Amino acid sequence: MRRGGACVQKKEYLPLTSRQPGVCLLSEILVRALEARSFFLVVVTVPAGEVAYAESQVACDSRLSAFPSRTRPVILYVPGAHTRSASVRAGLDAMATHAPDVVLVHDGARPFVSVALIHSVLEATCRYGAAVPVIEATDTPKGVAADGSIETHLIRSRVRLAQTPQGFCYASLCAAHHRAATDGEQYTDDSELYARYGGTVHVCAGERSNVKITYPEDLEQRASEPALTRGISVLPCTEEGALRVGLGTDMHALCAGRPLILAGIHIPSKKGAQGHSDADVLAHASIDALLGAAGLGDIGTFFPSCDGRWKDAHSCALLRHTWQLVRAACWRLVNLDAVVCLEQPALHPFREAMRASLAQALDTHVTRVFVKAKTAERLGPVGSGAAVTAQVVVLLKKI
């Protein structure tokens, strides 16, 4: 969330409705961010000298205190600068000690962002690395020259209107912002800046209700709608404590000359699994189970075999990265239960090492992880020694 020091009219402090003067645009955004239960840190940049005032305005909204303190993210107010880009950069720099994987940048003049849109942008960002919500243009856009004449007739079907929040890999966005500062360049939004310095930005569906308050009549129009005239009554998200089950399976062919890796543990064997990475079926099935339970996608979404970056990759490192994404979405691991099916060699001697390795990758106690080893009784491709398989079930709890 951003406020630049050059803004004269402080729209973010305006009351959302006359019936609830304690609810301002900024506090409404914060309530919706807390409702999403997907953030551990929220940074608000405000004009220099206005930190205390911003805090006092937000404190007037009693809804914020209704969120449990143990799950409430830290809200940090940071002095901004005289340009939009510099203010965003100040906010990003304030996050450096927290080292987030993903960051969403939201305009403080868009108070009607929905929790569903926040989750949609987060999911697309985790999948692609950068994502922006867009809506179709309903009016026919024109490119206008300095003298007021139309110089370009844009194709409306190919034009989209960008909204916020816009999501990015934190480290990549920081690097792009600092390069832009060095070059002295200014951009109207972060997706343009990110793309200018080599990043690819994908789009996801925005919402027409996610309007930007630019003129007084924008707020007046929204305030007259029934949902707002009834008053705003937002309770903490009922998703807290929700349980989700995920299932992951994987199978790889076995061949001579390859190492056999299971949960990051090297298993002495005449044959190993074929694959683009280290072909660790137990780690791969665990990744799929976690992503499925959290509703974030699957292993092919994040680590496609066509991507050379994952050639011979250590799958437990991919599992650790996956868990960071799942944890950032406010999920806690209740337990993981796995079955590995391999005809030979016998896996029982390595079972505890595999449990410990998975627990370490998931930053959890080993008692929450269990691994069972089976044979296929000489049936099918596993029984003939041609393949190895794994099945994993996880239980996640929303926090």
Swiss-Prot record:
Its cofactor is a divalent metal cation. Coiled coil: none annotated. It catalyses: 2-C-methyl-D-erythritol 4-phosphate + CTP + H(+) = 4-CDP-2-C-methyl-D-erythritol + diphosphate; 4-CDP-2-C-methyl-D-erythritol 2-phosphate = 2-C-methyl-D-erythritol 2,4-cyclic diphosphate + CMP. Keywords: Isoprene biosynthesis, Lyase, Metal-binding, Multifunctional enzyme, Nucleotidyltransferase, Transferase. It comes from the Bacteria. GO terms for biological process: isopentenyl diphosphate biosynthetic process, methylerythritol 4-phosphate pathway; terpenoid biosynthetic process. In the N-terminal section; belongs to the IspD/TarI cytidylyltransferase family. IspD subfamily. This is Bifunctional enzyme IspD/IspF. The gene is ispDF.
